[in-house]
């Protein structure tokens, strides 16, 4: 097998991680709109970098208070939406690892993903996603914590 080595284009500090990206963004431009969320009246509401960081930290603190520890794996069954990004950063801030599971996965596939990863918790988006997970929950003794986005658990 042929191996090719290339020098890094950008030097990365061995002490930095992905959470630093958000902290750096807030330091540089806290009022910059990072996201826009649809409102019930059809309008859109901006979420600034500082607001997003506040939400991330609050959610990360909630995960830690619920017993999530560094290195824990948390499954996520969810379509692409704002809360996914919020969860990504909150899980990283808590030192845990997010295990994405396709929102179209069958109960068998959900079982494999959560079992193979060693997930100890699951976040589902909808009641239907939770129902598919619940079909195999008894076979996943490590998964002791469950949250649902649409139910407002987060």
Residue ranges and their predicted role:
Residues 1-18, 38:
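Flexible, non-catalytic linker and terminal segments flanking ANL/adenylate-forming cores
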Residues 11, 45, 49, 100:
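Flexible, glycine- and charge-enriched loops at secondary-structure boundaries
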Residues 13-35, 54:
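A short N-terminal helical cap/helix-turn-helix that marks the beginning
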Residues 22, 87, 133:
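Aromatic/hydrophobic pocket-lining residues that form π-stacking "cages" and hydrophobic walls in ligand
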Residues 30, 79, 98-100:
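Proline-centered helix-kink/hinge sites
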Residues 35-89, 106-111:
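Conserved AMP-binding/adenylate-forming core of the ANL superfamily
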Residues 66, 93-154:
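Structural core segment of the AMP-binding/adenylate-forming
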